Swiss-Prot record:
Protein name in UniProt: Translation initiation factor IF-2
Gene3D superfamilies assigned to the protein according to its UniProt record, in alphabetical order: 1.10.10.2480, P-loop containing nucleotide triphosphate hydrolases, Translation factors, Translation initiation factor IF- 2, domain 3
Keyword vocabulary terms for this entry: Cytoplasm, GTP-binding, Initiation factor, Nucleotide-binding, Protein biosynthesis
Tagged with keyword GTP-binding: yes
Length: 726
């Protein structure tokens, strides 16, 4: 059997090429064009489907033809010879189905003429196929249906297995007039479903391109849920020993098998303590921490706050506390450098107490660990406390699901292309997985751990670096693995398009200028404020004054205060929290200015406290929904009415008081009673459109959607003015 093109085979079996293509697709054979060549084995498979059914249909048609031959011959004694000849010719005409010259009338006349109606045998023969055509297909009424919002009467009837006219009738009986194409609300759908004893459930349409939906809890067997390692971030002031502590933990906890391995800097690493792994994010302080939070990624389970025992709480320490509190993660305080002679741990505890971190010895709930990162003292105590907090937090994951997680770092490598460091938060990541990362996608080509070793799988809380992406993602972007490569590609491309559109229509950050519009659109009633001042007294006084502003429905939220110039870290925090920065007798540095411009953060610089209060208070009052009052601006008396086709009734009027404006609303008063209230549609003097007509002048007025104007009516013009809040 030789090869053939699809259209050739279709011609052989008297079918359309599309039917053959559909059949090939059902057999999982790729087919897209009628010109495609099909192999001998594929032809054989098609023959089984089409030639077998063709044979059956031919046999049936022959049997029917023979039956039709016999029946006329049995009842021919009274017929003349010419009739017999015509009957004998008839089967030949039946076989010529595609003859364009064949007329339906000529085919029916010999068999369906007058004589056939008078013969009982002939009548019975004709009625045999009728019952087959009239057998009604009865659909069973389902016990439960799901429906999308905006379902029509016809679609509901189809789901219920009922006739649409029956649904229309039932709706009419409950007082709802609807046609087959009309959308139904939830109440109407439930009424109809109750009538048939069917449970109705609204189907929630999920946006497949929203990666956050894949992070929501999914159904999983309890057996599949397992404990996962904690993800820890170390934060603190610049010289308090964060890097030394990280190195100390890593060097003392590297297993024998890992010793001598080349460390791969992927932004995170994992160590083992008491046979339990702990993942540390090796990020550059709280800046990256906040950047991730600004993009909506919550990756950290525990924050280690490093404070030097000889230095105490410093500005960056306070910033780190505020970042951790804003992210709502538990804090463990590591009091470092206790080996120094000038160390004073009690002073550190007292200073941290001023920021809401009280040690357990003082009746608080914050864990304090004293250690020396250089000597390695207290490291074990810190790791034990991390494991204790982990047990309390009950961190769980399902390693059997497809992987989801967050990007820690990303770069464009000259030799490998886009490379991304990922933290697997749930599921298991494998080589070859189809993955969507932020606004890009690809397949996992290679995967290495923090020691630079190539691995094939990565479970929950394990940091890895992958290659194989189309583009470089951003730190904090989410990633999701899909089983279907086509689906991953489709979602990835859709997210790229959405990102392009979002960049074009990027919304502004909140500022005092656009605050009212932001609040109206987002119904946000909180104003996040960061205060930087020249002296602590001024900062505290300003914060206290702002907190005293009493405007109903609006709250001032001080998220950070400090002494010193406005820096880049302040701008990052303001951007993440969608807040504003107030500088009192201080200026922003060069990096802060550049960052504020790039992030769209509003900075307000002042030297007088009451002006700050006045400006903030004004903005907050604008945040509330405005109140309006009516102001009457004029009256006019209708002297004459003229009806003009396509325009309506024009009222020839005389302004008796004030003025009538084109954009004003009017109240039509007749015999002291208000008969209509609406908008001025047109205002003219002679043939010219005018914006307003003053007292003592005549004009022509038409009212929007109202023509029942009579002579003697009074037009009262008014506008709605916004009331300024006290």
């Amino acid at each position: 059997m030789s090869k053939k093109r699809i259209y050739e085979y279709a011609k052989e079996v008297s079918l359309k090429s599309k039917d053959i293509i559909d059949a090939l697709k059902k057999m999982n054979i790729e087919a897209s064009s009628h010109m495609q060549v099909i192999e001998a084995k594929e032809i054989a498979a098609l023959d089984k489907i089409f030639k077998k059914s063709d044979t059956k249909s031919e046999v049936k048609s022959e049997q029917k033809a023979e039956a039709k031959k016999e029946e006329p011959n049995k009842e021919q004694p009274k017929k003349e010879e010419p009739k017999k000849q015509s009957d004998q010719k008839r089967p030949q005409n039946n076989n010529q189905k595609r003859n364009p010259n064949h007329r339906p009338g000529s085919h029916n006349k010999p068999g369906t003429g007058g004589p056939s109606k008078n013969k009982k045998g002939k009548g019975k023969g004709k009625q045999k196929p009728e019952p087959k055509q009239e057998v009604p297909v009865v659909k069973e009424t389902p016990s439960k249906i799901t429906y999308e919002e905006g379902i029509t009467v016809g679609e509901l009837a189809e789901k219920l297995g009922k006739d649409a006219s029956e649904i229309v009738k039932n709706l009419f009986m409950v007082g709802i007039m609807a046609n087959i194409n009309q959308s139904l609300n939830q109440e109407a759908i439930e009424l109809i479903c109750d009538e048939y004893g069917v449970e109705a459930e609204l189907e929630v349409v999920v946006d497949a391109t929203d990666l956050e939906t894949y992070f929501e809890d999914v159904d999983a067997n309890e057996e599949d849920i397992m404990e996962r390692p904690p993800v820890v971030t170390i934060m603190g002031h610049v010289d308090h020993g964060k890097t030394t502590l990280l190195d100390s933990i890593r060097n003392t906890r590297v297993t024998a098998g890992e010793a001598g391995g080349i460390t791969q800097h992927i932004g995170a690493y994992q160590i083992e303590y008491n046979d339990k792994p702990i993942t540390f994010l090796d990020t550059p302080g709280h800046a990256a921490f906040t950047t991730m939070r600004a993009r909506g990624a919550q990756v950290t389970d525990i924050t280690i706050l490093v404070v030097a025992a000889d230095d105490g709480v410093m500005p960056q320490t306070v910033e780190a506390i505020n970042h951790a509190k804003a992210a709502e993660v538990p804090i463990i305080v590591a009091v470092n450098k206790i080996d120094k002679p000038t160390a004073n741990p009690d002073r550190v505890m007292q200073e941290l107490g001023e920021h809401g971190l009280y040690p357990e010895d003082w009746g608080g709930d914050t864990i304090f660990v004293q250690l020396s990162a250089i000597k390695g003292d207290g490291i074990d105590d810190l790791l034990e406390m991390i494991q204790l907090v982990t047990e309390v937090e009950e961190l769980k994951a399902n390693p059997k699901r497809t992987a989801i997680g967050t990007v820690i770092e990303a770069e464009l490598d000259k030799s490998r292309g886009p490379a991304a460091s990922l933290l697997v938060q749930d599921g298991t990541l494998e080589i070859g997985d189809s993955i969507v990362v932020g606004n890009t996608f690809g397949r996992v080509r290679a995967m290495v751990n923090d020691l630079g070793k190539r691995i094939k799988t990565a479970g929950p809380s394990l940091p890895v670096e992958i290659t194989g992406l189309q583009d470089v993602p951003l730190a904090g972007d989410r990633f999701v693995v899909f089983k279907d490569e086509k689906k991953a590609r489709r979602i990835g491309e859709a997210r790229q398009q959405q990102n392009i559109l979002a960049q074009r229509q990027e919304s502004q950050k909140v500022s005092l200028d656009n605050l009212f519009e932001q609040m109206k659109q987002g119904e946000m009633k909180d104003l996040n404020v960061i205060i930087k001042g020249d002296v602590q007294g001024s900062v505290e006084a300003l914060a206290a004054s702002l907190m005293k502003i009493d405007v109903e429905g609006v709250n001032v939220r001080i998220i950070h205060t400090a002494v010193g110039a406005i820096n880049e870290s302040d701008v990052t925090l303001a951007s993440a929290s969608n807040g504003i920065i107030i500088g009192f007798n201080v200026r922003p540095d060069v990096n802060a200015k550049r960052a504020a411009e790039a992030e769209g953060v509003d900075m307000r610089l002042h030297r007088i406290i009451y002006k700050v209060i006045e400006e903030i208070e004004s903005a907050m009052k604008g945040m509330l929904d405005p109140e309006f009052e009516e102001k009457v601006i004029g009256q006019a008396e209708v002297r004459q009415t003229i009806n003009i086709s396509k325009v309506g009734t024009v009222a020839g009027s005389y302004v008796t008081d004030g003025k009538i404006t084109r954009d004003s609303q009017v109240r039509i008063i007749r015999d002291g009673i208000v008969v209509y209230e609406g908008q001025v549609d047109a205002l003219k003097r002679f043939k010219d459109d005018v914006r307003e007509v003053a007292q003592g002048y005549e004009c022509g007025i038409t009212i929007e959607n109202f023509n029942d104007i009579k002579e003697g009516d009074i037009f009262e013009a008014f506008v709605m003015e916004e009331i300024k809040r006290a």
